[in-house]
């Protein structure tokens, strides 16, 4: 049965909305849920559905999940709008207490990941970017090529991301840009890569691949 249901108002009847997955994070001794919504980033109590906080400033269409790390939540608009960060633990309308808010012009589909104080995110036009979590400033921005729809995957200190043309890029998760490898699958890819138990799963248009050390 439905445990709780929270109604949310839409902006208008155009093709605007949220494709973002709710993200659970820990604050002190309890869990909260963050969700990038049309125009806002919001936090909810996962047990009751009660809205705990909200922050204005996102665009009308949001694809990426909220990025979590270093006590910060980062909401990223999907289409030509903004990106912003708030500190965990806020209550009520925290718009005036945003950590930072920056405008952007490139479309983002895949979700980003936070590692050691930096947000790593991909742009649909084929650009990977490293952003300082504390300031929102871009540290590096490099064109990988193709159209990047997949989410950034962090495994250890390496980043993995795929483009729709079927290439998989491996980057160093560092404020100094370094491309480690580029692998061509020769099949279209729109899904994000998925790790499990030392293996990497890759879903293309026609096949599902598992990459890793061969097991006995």
Regions picked out by a protein language model, each given a short descriptive name:
Residues 1, 45-49, 87-92, 132-136, ...:
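Short loop/turn segments that connect beta-strands within beta-propeller blades
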Residues 3-30, 36-38, 54-69, 76-79, ...:
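Extracytoplasmic beta-rich repeat domains
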Residues 23, 42, 67, 84-86, ...:
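Conserved hydrophobic/aromatic positions in well-ordered beta-strands
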Residues 35-40, 127:
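Surface-exposed extracellular loop regions of Gram-negative outer-membrane beta-barrel proteins
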Residues 38, 78, 88, 124, ...:
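Short loop/turn segments immediately following the C-termini of beta-strands
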Residues 81-83, 166-167, 173, 187-216:
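Blade-level signature of beta-propeller repeat domains, shared across WD40, Kelch, NHL, RCC1
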Residues 81-83, 104-173:
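Loop/turn-rich, solvent-exposed surfaces of beta-rich toroidal or solenoidal domains
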